[in-house]
């Protein structure tokens, strides 16, 4: 069995910070559509020229921010991969994530350019969604943190009965692409 690739956690954390800074700079209550307009422009540019990601790799997680689903059973895998700095191979990765159908052309273009970068960007999105943002949260006791975490995940209960069902608007049939 080939040795697993390593995730570069320091790079992922740097990408997370840079992506979050970009997201924050456009997330302004006075211009509520600014982030949406910015990400829409980025998607078009990156889809046309994924090589741009060499100089601005944080733009991919910004472009996909809030538009990727991590099924509840997959979150444990992502937590493990990040804790052990293990990069999943494509077959492991593709079943732990759901991209919005509208983003598929971009996702496929980036995958063709750099599968590793796509996986890294999804690790960034996982961290943004599950660890909170780059800015430190107000200090609280450990007990408060634990109770808050439970409420943060109320939307992702494990008793979802949609196992095997498709969620409208999300795509998870990558094997079909290769046929």
UniProtKB/Swiss-Prot annotation:
Induction: Part of the atcJABC operon. The operon is constitutively expressed, and expression shows only a very slight increase at low temperature. Disruption phenotype: Deletion of the gene does not affect growth at low temperature. This is Adaptation to cold protein A. Part of an operon involved in cold adaptation. Residues 133-179 are annotated as: Disordered. Residues 144-179 have a biased composition (Acidic residues). The gene is atcA. It comes from the Bacteria.
């Amino acid at each position: 069995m080939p040795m697993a690739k390593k995730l570069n956690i320091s790079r992922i954390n740097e990408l997370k910070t840079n992506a979050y800074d970009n997201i924050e700079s456009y997330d302004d209550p006075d211009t509520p559509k600014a982030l949406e307009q910015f990400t829409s422009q980025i998607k078009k540019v990156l889809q046309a020229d994924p090589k741009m990601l060499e100089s601005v790799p944080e733009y991919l997680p910004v472009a996909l921010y809030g538009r990727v689903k991590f099924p509840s059973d997959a979150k444990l895998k992502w937590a493990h991969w990040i804790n052990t700095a293990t990069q999943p191979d494509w077959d492991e990765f593709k079943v732990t994530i759901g991209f919005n159908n509208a983003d598929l052309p971009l996702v496929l273009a980036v995958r063709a350019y750099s599968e590793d970068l796509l996986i890294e960007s999804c690790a960034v999105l996982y961290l943004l969604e599950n660890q909170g943002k780059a800015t430190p949260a107000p200090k609280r006791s450990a007990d408060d943190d634990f109770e808050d975490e439970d409420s943060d995940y109320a939307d992702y209960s494990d008793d979802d009965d949609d196992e095997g069902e498709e969620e409208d608007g999300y795509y998870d049939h990558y094997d079909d692409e290769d046929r």
